[in-house]
Amino acid sequence: MGSGYAKKKKEAKMMEQQFLEMEASLEKKHYEGQAGNGLVSIVINGKCDIVSVKVQPTCLDPEDPEVIEDLFHSAFKEAKEAMDKELSVMRASMPF
């Protein structure tokens, strides 16, 4: 149980450190999604927190609030997909 156990413990510690570094890196990154040809723009960070939202006044129609709701949803989905794509690349490079 001597050197084999110590080696596995060291590998686990290295993987934990790599994971923490990846997590910290993601927190600093921003991913943007747009909808309606830029009428709505949402920026999220790697923790999926919304960093900013921009709305062009031309898409605000009090008679049809569902339009803006759909645009927000689409913009957020696009930003999340960009984040997920990068995250999957990062995960693929991890040794575990």
UniProtKB/Swiss-Prot annotation:
UniProt record similarity statement: Belongs to the YbaB/EbfC family.
GO cellular component, one term: bacterial nucleoid
Record keywords, A-Z: Cytoplasm, DNA-binding
PANTHER family xref list: NUCLEOID-ASSOCIATED PROTEIN YBAB (PTHR33449:SF1)
Subunit annotation: Homodimer.
Matches recorded under HAMAP family: DNA_YbaB_EbfC (MF_00274)
Keyword presence, Cytoplasm: yes
Function comment: Binds to DNA and alters its conformation. May be involved in regulation of gene expression, nucleoid organization and DNA protection.
Source species: Chlamydia abortus (strain DSM 27085 / S26/3) (Chlamydophila abortus)
Localization annotation: Cytoplasm, Nucleoid
Name recorded for this polypeptide: Nucleoid-associated protein CAB326
Keyword Cytoplasm in record: yes
Lineage: Bacteria, Pseudomonadati, Chlamydiota, Chlamydiia, Chlamydiales
Chief location: cytoplasm
Pfam families: YbaB_DNA_bd
An example molecular function term from Gene Ontology annotations: DNA binding
